[in-house]
């Protein structure tokens, strides 16, 4: 791949300004449309990487990741009950490093049924060592009609700051479009990469119209 092709691909993904800013040592931030709050566009995912035991050989590198995230003016860390021990590890390490309050913590509900969803989410609060979670999302749209009612209530009461939905397959885009059209959401996490760009055509304009931040999750 030559330089021209590389720059074209970065521009198509909206990453060229980010790369330019990194070279100039500037901190780029993007606005959450529903609130005006600003976040850095790059965060830390925890699938597999934070699913570790108590061995210091596994945990020490992750402490370095959290330190670097904060040192570089980042804050977003994304997890899920689906990710094994990741929530527990994030909670323990960030507390040990006195960084928990500096993180923008996002996690998800990944189960069926109202009461089971409430139980699972409350467990996430405990594992992440938080009284308030920044972003709670419905993982892969699982039982989304039920969980969305709970999330709305929790947002109104201040238990969570933002709510959203996630998925990784283009086959769900029609359902996501209907959800966005009929339900106020703060965040949408969806697959988007050089190999999967349909979200830019179908979902991003609608998310922008409905003031939902597009939290793009590369698939490569």
Predicted segment positions?
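CE4/NodB-like, metal-dependent polysaccharide N-deacetylase domain
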Residues: 118-137, 153, 157
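Short, acidic/polar
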Residues: 56-68, 114-127, 171-178
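Conserved residues at the C-terminal ends of beta-strands
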Residues: 45, 80-83, 136-139, 166, ...
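Beta/alpha (TIM)-barrel catalytic core signal, keyed to glycine-rich beta->alpha loops juxtaposed to Asp/Glu
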Residues: 141-220
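Structural motif corresponding to the early beta-alpha repeats
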Residues: 81, 97-116, 140
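Generic structural signal for well-ordered alpha-helices
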Residues: 29, 66, 87, 91, ...
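N-terminal binding-site loop/beta-alpha segment at the start of enzyme catalytic domains
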Residues: 2-103
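Structural preference for beta-strand elements that scaffold enzyme active sites
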Residues: 41-43, 76, 102-106, 132-135, ...
């Amino acid at each position: 791949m030559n330089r021209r092709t590389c720059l074209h691909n970065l521009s198509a993904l909206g990453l060229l300004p980010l790369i330019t800013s990194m070279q100039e040592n500037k901190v780029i931030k993007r606005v959450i449309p529903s609130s005006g709050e600003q976040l850095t566009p790059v965060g830390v995912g925890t699938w597999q990487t934070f699913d570790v035991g108590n061995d210091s050989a596994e945990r020490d590198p992750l402490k370095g990741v959290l330190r670097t995230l904060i040192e570089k003016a980042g804050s977003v860390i994304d997890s899920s009950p689906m990710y094994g021990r990741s929530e527990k590890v994030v909670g323990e390490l960030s507390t040990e490093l006195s960084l928990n309050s500096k993180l923008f913590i996002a996690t998800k509900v990944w189960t069926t049924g109202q009461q089971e969803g409430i139980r699972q989410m409350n467990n996430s609060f405990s594992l992440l060592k938080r009284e308030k979670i920044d972003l709670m999302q419905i993982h892969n749209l699982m039982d989304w009609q039920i969980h969305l009612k709970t999330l709305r209530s929790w947002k109104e009461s201040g238990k969570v700051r933002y709510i959203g939905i996630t998925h990784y397959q283009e086959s769900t885009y029609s359902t996501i479009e209907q959800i966005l059209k009929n339900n106020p959401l703060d965040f949408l996490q969806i697959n988007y990469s050089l190999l999967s760009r349909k979200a830019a055509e179908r979902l991003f304009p609608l998310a922008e119209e409905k003031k939902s931040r597009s939290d793009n999750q590369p698939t490569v």
